[in-house]
């Protein structure tokens, strides 16, 4: 699909995808790519979907880092995840640029399914903060590779942070540092590898508008709808999207 000559209907769908990503980000802090990229991959080239998400992903995480900066209790954990996440993301992005679109589509679908399964089964493993800080570099590298490859590292990041006894605010701050750092290096890498041109860059920048509108709505939604009900709706939606991506020719 020619991204620069979209019809109005497709453009509207893309805006809704980013708005929905912002909604999920504002409600759970889980990361807008986990919903936006699978939606985008249904309608446009999956590699373009990943590239488009990088800039608004950086933007949304910087907002939440600023919003929750006063809640940090373990800055070392956030720092280690961010630093090693960028290292892994660099290698993942190199693989992303060199591989086929269909491979990226399947990776997006499989990682999304992994996210759904991990959300349904829950996480019975509990880690102390001391152990978490020790394994954070490894988690960061693995999460970074996955992020660079398909733009969705939520299953790894959420599984790790959910094993810790931390507040929602500290959770959002830590995961935003992780996602934000990876988004930054992903953008730089894509530009350096000549995968992103300035037209795509501007379209991605414009996508920050619907995403930023969705974030406060997501925050408000959690006050009206139970978190469990909201998550069930999102998981059902992700199952449908992933199945569609896998079965598409």
What is each of the regions a protein language model found here?
Residues 48-55, 80, 106, 173, ...:
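Signature of the 12-TM Major Facilitator Superfamily
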Residues 62-70, 107-132, 219-220, 240-249:
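Transmembrane helix exit motif
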Residues 2-43, 125-175, 182:
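Selected transmembrane alpha-helices and immediately adjacent juxtamembrane segments
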Residues 52-101, 184-227:
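Selective hydrophobic functional segments
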Residues 16, 20, 55-62, 79, ...:
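Hydrophobic residues within alpha-helical transmembrane segments
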Residues 75-76, 98-112, 122-125, 224-225, ...:
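Loop-to-transmembrane alpha-helix entry segments
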Residues 10-11, 41-58, 102-112, 141-151, ...:
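Structural signature of hydrophobic alpha-helical transmembrane segments
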Residues 91-96, 145-152, 186, 240-249:
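Hydrophobic alpha-helical transmembrane segments in multi-pass integral membrane proteins
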